Amino acid sequence: TTANIDIVTKKDEPGIDIIIKPGTKNESVHIPVILSESGLKDMVYNDFYIGEGADVTIVAGCGIHNCGVDTSEHDGIHTFYIGKNAKVKYIEKHYGEGDGAGERILNPTTIVHIEDGGYMEMETTQIKGVDSTVRDTKADLADGATLVIKEKIMTHGRQTAETNFTVELNGVDSSANVISRSVAKGESKQVFNSNICGNNQCYGHTECDAILMDNGHVKAVPSLEANNLDASLVHEAAIGKIAGDQLIKLMTLGLTEAQAEEQIAKTGANEISISATGNGVENVTKSIISAMSTSTGEGVTGFDVKA
């Protein structure tokens, strides 16, 4: 808690309320969660109240370390109430590790309400090691409100990832830009669902760009719904293997074909390299904190370790 930011533990359900006063500028909130016990299933409800005219950065994420045989799961439900002319940058990162047979599951839900003139930019990244994820995002925008979503996902092995975006452009001159970048390696499978509804004079754009490697599988299911004559909605999608000319360029610089493919995959999904030392919960703690150390300004942290 600071002079402008209050973090209050909920009394009726697990989670916290983050209350940011109107006019707050250049401050940040960090909310990392670490699960280190095999078989632990955790659900939290975190609500963010962003006052009128505030300009803040919120950093959240979860790391799971599972060396056992049971499934470890974290489901985080984050709801944002963004006031008039407020600006929020939300950064969310997920990471999993552990040599046990137990699965690592992360199911984030993000609900966003943006009032007149409000702005939110979301950067969501699934780094590695997550066996299964269903990522749901729902948003409604008032007059002049803007939502920008940048999703980055990498799956490998037999992992599965499903992302679902639903955006209601209710206000005059509201706008949304939903961009997904992903890499599917091994036998992994991904599904990208996007639904933008233009209910007023507005602009909506959704884009899926996926790289396939090995026997990866990606399915993109766009949906645009125009309910107003002045709604302008656009969808773009590109799914395929790495282009041969891209490989050749890197191989002429001395990389092997495998090294070139790996480099392109990292660039395509903007993969975060984690090189923390140590083991067990120490390693995953360092990893997720390192991955989340991207914001600037005065900050307040709520840290939750489940062990």
Language-model features: locations:
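Type III/flagellar secretion export determinants
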Residues: 250, 274-307
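Short, intrinsically disordered, charge-balanced linker/junction segments flanking boundaries
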Residues: 256-259, 263, 301, 305
